[in-house]
Regions:
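Conserved NTP-binding/hydrolysis module of P-loop NTPases
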Residues: 40-41, 46-70, 300
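Accessory nucleic acid-recognition modules appended to NTPase machines
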Residues: 201-371
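Domain-level recognition of nuclease-like catalytic cores that cleave nucleotide substrates
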Residues: 415-447
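Conserved small helical "lid"/interfacial subdomain of P-loop NTPases
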Residues: 159-184
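P-loop NTPase Walker A phosphate-binding motif
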Residues: 18-40
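Sensor-1/coupling segment of RecA-like P-loop NTPase cores
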Residues: 13-16, 104-151
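Conserved catalytic cores of phosphodiester-cleaving nucleases, focusing on short active-site segments
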Residues: 344, 372-392, 403, 419
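Mid-core helix/loop region of P-loop NTP-binding domains shared across ATPases and GTPases
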Residues: 68-98, 104-108, 119-130
Length: 447
């Protein structure tokens, strides 16, 4: 982003991502990293009225201006006035304006995105365009995506759109300083890929001790954050998330649980990245989809904490953590399976698996229920079949036999596909062959 801000050309950048993903940290780092030849302003919007927001913006802007420009600064009548003033000052000195939580301005100022569009359409085409960089950042990702859509005010206006997502397990491993791999998976299963959550996890303590402190104590970060998130979502999005997290995976099941129409609110949940729609890899485009909570932390909270918040706040956190141990192990298993798929994608990138192989999960939709954690398709044929197990004992030949059984069901397998086992305790060497690969947590997180 520093490169974007120092081109000398007008730039309109949109940065979106969920709360706690690190947007504000990144933006403040950008402000600090800008060289002395550029004036930089960081403004964090809030839920105040437009007049109050404009006054605060002027107060933040003034110290960044040259004395001559600061002397011209008057109270802004509206946001078009404010942005036009910024464009005028950027003609003599490059100016970076960062507006964080911009969706609050969209709520307090009717047509705020259209105002940005008007100012941008006026200055961007000019041969002597001002060196103004505007960065709009926000956590209400569905609202931002609406603004960027075909019918939105900023359709095709930004010079760059950056969508921040939570860390993958491998990225979290690097961020946390490469702790013991098994401990990382435990932290990730509870914290998800959010830097603030991971920073709070103490790798010098056991998983249970961390869970008691962060999730099983009144006011614990992992207990409270999801409550805040769900409270901020419009109804019925929060009820949709709870229904999906509690196992309602089909549209009809979700509708019955929520008791209202799903089209728009479910679409918003998908666009925020909290929910994903999945189907077996290789299935027809019109195949019925299932819905799943895509956010690891939110899935942890709904799966383990949602039904017990009052008990934890009443001081029964230790009992709750003990009572939900089975669900905790299921959460670890699903996180480990997703990490195996991400690792397989890395193996394709590095050339260990055939170039062009598509990786995802697969299951039968009728007849005998068969689930394959990792299936790789190349030209519509199954070339990779894998299974991931969160168990202490190293995986062996009996686990490999399960892959051979799955071979009878997967789509059009080649004669000698590559089998892969991923195990929490690794894979026994006598189980591996030239066509059966085995990996443990350390190898999975190295990608």
């Amino acid at each position: 982003m520093v490169d974007i801000a120092t081109t000398g050309k007008p730039q309109l950048v949109v940065l979106s991502g969920p709360r706690r993903v690190g947007k504000t940290f990144l933006l403040r780092h950008l402000i600090q990293a800008i060289g002395p030849g550029i004036s930089a302003v960081y403004f964090e919007a809030n839920q105040a009225a437009e007049v109050a927001q404009l006054r605060r913006f002027g107060e933040v802007l003034a110290p960044a201006l040259d004395p001559e420009d600061a002397a011209l600064l008057q109270p802004f009548a509206n946001w078009e006035h404010a942005l036009n003033f910024c464009a005028a000052t950027a003609r003599t000195r490059p100016l970076l304006i960062v507006i964080d939580e911009v969706t609050y301005l969209m709520g307090s100022t009717t047509g705020f995105a259209s105002i940005v569009q008007t100012v941008w359409d006026r200055i961007a085409p000019l041969a002597n365009a001002p060196s103004l960089v505007i960065v709009l950042a926000g956590s209400a990702t569905a609202m931002i995506e609406d603004t960027l859509s075909y019918s939105g005010a900023l359709y095709q206006r930004p010079t760059q759109v950056i969508r921040l997502s939570p860390f993958t397990a491998a990225e979290a491993y690097a961020y946390c300083g490469r702790p013991e791999p098994e401990a990382l998976f435990e932290a990730y299963a509870a914290c998800g890929g959010y830097p603030l959550h991971l920073d709070a996890w103490d790798f010098g303590q056991s998983a249970r001790e961390n869970l008691l402190q962060l999730a099983g104590s009144p006011g614990g970060l992992l207990l409270e954050d999801a409550v805040i998130l769900l409270d901020r979502l419009p109804d019925p999005q929060s009820r949709i998330l709870l229904a999906i997290g509690q196992g309602r995976s089909r549209r009809s099941e979700i509708a019955n649980e929520v008791g209202s129409r799903l089209e728009r609110p479910l679409d918003s949940c998908l666009r925020t990245g909290f929910v994903c729609a999945i189907k077996p890899i290789g299935s027809p485009r019109k195949a019925r989809r299932q819905y799943r909570i895509a956010d690891t932390y939110l899935r942890f909270w709904i799966r383990i904490l949602a039904d017990h918040v009052q008990r934890i706040e009443g001081g029964q956190g230790e009992e709750v953590i003990s009572h939900t141990h089975g669900e905790w192990q299921n959460q670890l298993g699903s996180v480990f399976e997703q990490a195996a798929r991400e690792h397989a994608i890395g193996l394709v990138r590095s050339g260990v698996l055939p170039t062009g192989t598509l990786i995802d999960e697969w299951w039968t939709t009728s007849g005998e229920q068969i689930q394959v954690d990792v299936l790789g398709l190349l030209d519509h044929r199954s070339v990779v079949i894998g299974e991931a197990k969160w168990q202490k004992q190293p995986l062996g030949t009996s686990d490999a036999a399960g892959l051979w059984r799955a071979l009878r069901y997967v789509p059009d397998p080649i004669p000698e596909p590559t089998f892969i086992l991923w195990g929490r305790g690794g894979v026994r060497q006598d189980a591996t062959t030239s066509h059966l690969l085995g990996f443990g947590p350390a190898e999975m997180l190295a990608y």
